[in-house]
Amino acid sequence: MRNKVYIGVDFGGTKILTGAMTNEGKIIGEPVKVSTDSNDTSEKIFKKVTDSVEHVIQQIDMKNFEVDGIGMGVTGPIDIRNGVILECPQLPTMHFFPLKRKVKDFFSLPVYMNNDANCLIYGEALYGSGAGLNSVVGFTLGTGIGCAIVMDNKILNGSTDSAAEIWPSPYLDGTIEDYVSGSGVSKIYREICVQEESDSKSSLEIAMLAEKGDTNALKTWDEFGRHLAVAVSWTINLIDPNIIILGGSIANAFKFFSSSMEKNLRKQICPTPAEKTKIVCAKLGPNAGFIGAAALAVNKV
């Protein structure tokens, strides 16, 4: 009897990363990465998806393995139940594209789909920093802020597939995403330095300055940690998870904002989780997205 293997597709706005794994999270073969372009037609993008899946399948020893399903983590917003991309600002030709049905018809395999942020955290919850825990909340910190909730090995989607979408929540003079995101880090730095927007630096540049001991950069990350603590406190007080996982490019600067975040967070949450809830970084690296997507197929969700 052949062992089952599952394909995961991490479908982002600029790239598609596809890989295969077992139900235990062991990666089979080499993941395949292809770039996408905003000028690509929907047909061209769909072909990139199918080509990458086929390339991954070709690496699998079919004498010992059989493909049991495909999971996709897709940039959105998306209609999870029907498997349709509703809107994709970076790939406008994919608006209202029925990706799940198209992939299912092409490969004649079961296909499962969720949004990319959910899948990244799902991978971490099952096989990464949250493995073995039954209640996980994760944040993806990059260009924007994403949030996902995993309970009893299932993603909490909500009645309209919008659970944990905290980015538009009102905060100070705007939304929480205005402060807890890559653009938020740049905004904080500009205000500390009293710079014009044209002189703005990216979060990566500000992290590099902090590495060199730049005072304004260090102040920026300290302030960012204070704002992040607010977002994290909302979810802890509401969900009471075992653990909070931070992923995305900004999490790479964890050492610069962790102290400020922890100090402010513990004051804003209930006493028991204040003592027990851990905040950790994601550990699966760039493969987390396709691992979480493949896990959709493993668990048939």
Q: What would you call each of these model-derived segments?
A:
Residues I85-H95:
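A charged helix-plus-loop insertion that forms the helical arch/lid used to bind
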Residues A131-S183:
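Glycine-rich phosphate-binding loop of actin/hexokinase-like ATP-binding domains
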Residues V32-K33, Q90, T160:
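Short clusters of small/polar residues that mark proteolytic maturation junctions
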